[in-house]
Swiss-Prot record:
Gene encoding the protein: atpF2
Keyword Protein transport attached: no
Cited InterPro entries: ATP_synth_b (IPR034679), ATP_synth_b/b'su_bac/chlpt (IPR002146), ATP_synthase_B_chain (IPR050059)
Top-rank taxon: Eukaryota
Origin species: Guillardia theta
Protein name: ATP synthase subunit b', chloroplastic
Subcellular compartments: Plastid, Chloroplast thylakoid membrane
Length: 163
């Protein structure tokens, strides 16, 4: 049994001396070649297509951002031009409104003056008609007064002659 333990200890010592953390035999360069081959395959199959897609996407985004910036600049320029045109149109409309108001005020003033003249003419005409009628009435009254005075006079005289 002691021999058996001795043989087991020798086998364990032999196993430890053969394989350690790094074995410098043909396996190490083979593993290095496998890693390099794996890296080349991954680069060709995975990394290059992914990098290409990422580059295309970046270019697409950059292109869209540039187009959006151009469109935004054009929209802002158009907006400024429309605002400028709108301000000019408002000024012109305000000028037209003020001219129309002045013309309307002038027309109203003329119509008021004409109405005042017409009213004055009507008043003068009515006054002259009233004065004319007054003169006629006074003349008629004077004639009647004269007639009545003549009648009274003749009655008085006839009464005096009779008495």
């Amino acid at each position: 049994m002691t021999n058996y333990l001795y043989i087991l200890a020798l086998q364990i010592a032999e196993a430890e001396s053969e394989g350690g953390l790094f074995d410098f035999n043909a396996t190490l360069p083979l593993m290095a070649v496998q890693i390099l081959l794996f890296m080349v395959i991954l680069n060709a199959v995975f990394y290059n297509p992914v990098a290409k897609v990422l580059d295309e996407r970046e270019e697409y985004i950059r292109k869209n951002l540039t187009q959006a910036s151009d469109i935004l600049a054009k929209a802002e320029a158009i907006t400024k031009q429309y605002e400028k045109d709108l301000a000019q149109e408002r000024r012109e409309a305000q000028l037209i409104i003020s001219v129309a108001q002045k013309e309307a005020q002038d027309i109203v003033a003329l119509e008021i003056k004409q109405a005042q003249k017409d009213t004055e003419l009507l008043v003068n005409e009515a006054t002259s008609q009233l004065n004319s009628q007054k003169q006629k009435a006074l003349s008629a009254l004077e004639d009647q007064v004269n007639t009545l005075t003549e009648q009274i006079k003749s009655k008085l005289l006839s009464n005096q002659l009779i008495s």
